[in-house]
């Protein structure tokens, strides 16, 4: 009668850890996908906004040409143009922040893959031991049968 492998519980724990690590990779990859989509969206938004801003500045200057404005209104006009430039900086900062998020997510994916590799190695060690143990047990049983 075969006895049960004494490290079965440890093997179960190792297999569970390996599966958990694999799920961690899936979660990290999903986060990375989402971060990349967000980055592309931000970039497209920035480019569209820049195009609109250029057209808006041109439209504002065209409306200004040939008119007499008091200094106060000219100052307000210049402040409006400056606000557009500030808005561009804020949108560019959002793109940079999204790019940083992508880099962070890429690092998390790498770390998660490293955890899977480590967990797989640990599981493989126990599986190799179990295979050797099974062979030894089989040989002992064959010897016991041969003696009887």
What residue spans do the PLM features occupy?
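Charge-rich amphipathic alpha-helical interaction elements
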Residues: 1-148
């Amino acid at each position: 009668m075969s006895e049960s492998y004494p490290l079965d519980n440890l093997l179960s724990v190792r297999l569970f850890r390996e599966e958990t690590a694999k799920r961690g990779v899936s979660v990290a990859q999903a986060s990375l996908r989402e971060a990349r989509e967000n980055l592309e969206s931000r970039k497209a938004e920035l480019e569209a906004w820049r195009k609109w801003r250029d057209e808006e500045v041109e439209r504002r200057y065209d409306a200004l040409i040939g008119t007499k404005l008091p200094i106060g209104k000219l100052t307000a006009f210049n402040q409006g143009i400056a606000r557009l430039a500030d808005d561009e900086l804020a949108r560019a900062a959002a793109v940079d922040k999204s790019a940083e998020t992508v880099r962070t997510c890429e690092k998390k994916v790498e770390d998660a893959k490293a955890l899977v590799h480590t967990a797989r190695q640990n599981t493989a060690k126990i599986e190799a031991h179990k295979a050797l143990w099974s062979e030894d047990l089989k040989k002992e049983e064959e010897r016991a049968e041969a003696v009887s």
